[in-house]
């Protein structure tokens, strides 16, 4: 009788494990219900007053309950010798409003610069934007976001000094073609030789907020990290929004240092996964740069026994994408790496991240770190504990021990 019971229990355990594995690859396995009032419409003030849910050790097979702390407690949670990797991308004023020659109103969202002053953009309404259509944009008034020159979006092509725009209150663009992959349009902006659109976005564009933020009173600078330097993103790396200059200084004082990568966050970050078998999902491309100095810091930290803590899923994609060959190297280019349960980690050991949308590639990435079922249980606890979700929401810290990682 005992043998029969034991056999039955083994069969049930095997069946449950198989079902859980199947859900790891099923879109339905990443669904959860979020009350609308839990979607943060405004950021915490000050930044580091946001809440921090700490997922700690799970090395004995028994889950330790998460700890509920405040983000400014981070220096007391991390260890001296740990290294935080941060994304220094800067959100550009990529949303522009204009009109066609017929007077019809137009909204566009810049996605990426394909060549100098020639941009791929989403257009709304988009059905009637045929080749040759001209769009006229009116100035919104100069802003002080401090767009700087960067290798990815140079302010002027080599050999051409910037020249003044003839009409400083108006900007025009012409539709060159439709992009089949995105449904967007390739727009050629009509500017004097040597003049860059990036220089003019402060005047003609707006910072685009995510579609789920509908009633925000946030200033533009609140949707930038305090260490943002390289313009090119159309969405903020939101895990970094919680840091203040004072907190960064306190971390350095504790010998918890920081290194930087650049990943220009694209519109794909908001798009849900739509295929039922998540393994067949085609990830969007994003531009990344991993400097040699950051690679050296990471290798030195690991050699000294420190832990590599990624600040945000963008950093995870950048580091793991650059280490796809098995060894992290200096890198500049695009990645379409899709991380989901079963992924074999190369660089990242811990993660600071916000709470993500159901059925999103970001939720799958975090699931690859600590397990899908465990993550969804943590999300339910966060909802019950009144945490704020998504871009302006609270954060969670996944320590390496939570994954069973033996850090050196």
Swiss-Prot record:
Top enzyme category: transferase
Enzyme Commission designation: 2.4.99.17
Catalytic activity: 7-aminomethyl-7-carbaguanosine(34) in tRNA + S-adenosyl-L-methionine = epoxyqueuosine(34) in tRNA + adenine + L-methionine + 2 H(+)
Listed InterPro entries: QueA, QueA_dom1, QueA_dom2, QueA_sf
Keyword presence, Kinase: no
GO BP field: queuosine biosynthetic process; tRNA wobble guanine modification
Keywords: Cytoplasm, Queuosine biosynthesis, S-adenosyl-L-methionine, Transferase
Stored SUPFAM superfamilies: QueA-like
This protein's pathway: tRNA modification; tRNA-queuosine biosynthesis
Pfam families xrefs: Queuosine_synth
GO MF entries: S-adenosylmethionine:tRNA ribosyltransferase-isomerase activity
Subcellular localization(s) per the UniProt record: Cytoplasm
Described purpose of this protein according to its UniProt entry: Transfers and isomerizes the ribose moiety from AdoMet to the 7-aminomethyl group of 7-deazaguanine (preQ1-tRNA) to give epoxyqueuosine (oQ-tRNA).
NCBIfam families: PRK00147.1 (NF001140), queA (TIGR00113)
Protein name as annotated: S-adenosylmethionine:tRNA ribosyltransferase-isomerase
Source species of the chain: Trichormus variabilis (strain ATCC 29413 / PCC 7937) (Anabaena variabilis)
Gene that specifies this protein: queA
